[in-house]
Amino acid sequence: MSQENVEIVRTAIDAFNRGDWEATLSATAPEFEFDMSRSIGPQRGIYRLAEVRAFWSDWVGAFDSVHQDIEEFIEAGDEVVVSSVMHVKGREGVEAQARAAWVFTFRDGVAVRASMYQTKLDALEALGLRE
């Protein structure tokens, strides 16, 4: 099931990059959690499925453009680790990027949690893995 989970995450990130929240969340469980508790920004917290669309709309709406590039997928049983770079362009034309890693947790073929980590190493260590 791991490769299927990777494809679900890849499809969700592609949909996120298009701004299609419904498609992004189409393979999530009703109890899905978007865990930004390790964020260093003002969006720190854990968001339930009902809150995620508004969170993304507010966050993406602060920029002229937002795009996430995937660097790597790591299959880990019911989890998928994704290292990525988020590219943003502000209203004044200033561009920035930030690296992060995500752990997507799956149960019965749907995502139940997406947890953000500052680095791929942090994400792997949270799962008891090493590079």
Give the location of each predicted region.
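Short, surface-exposed coil-to-beta transition loops
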Residues: 66-68, 95-102
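Short, low-complexity N-terminal intrinsically disordered segments enriched in polar/charged residues
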Residues: 1-30, 110, 126-131
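Short beta-strand edge/turn micro-motifs at domain boundaries
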Residues: 102-125
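Hydrophobic beta-strand positions in extracellular immunoglobulin-like domains
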Residues: 86-88, 106
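A short hydrophobic beta-strand element
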Residues: 77-86
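A short, polar/proline- and glycine-enriched secondary-structure boundary/capping micro-motif
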Residues: 92-95, 122-128
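A solvent-exposed, acidic/Ser-Thr-rich amphipathic alpha-helical stretch
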Residues: 22-78
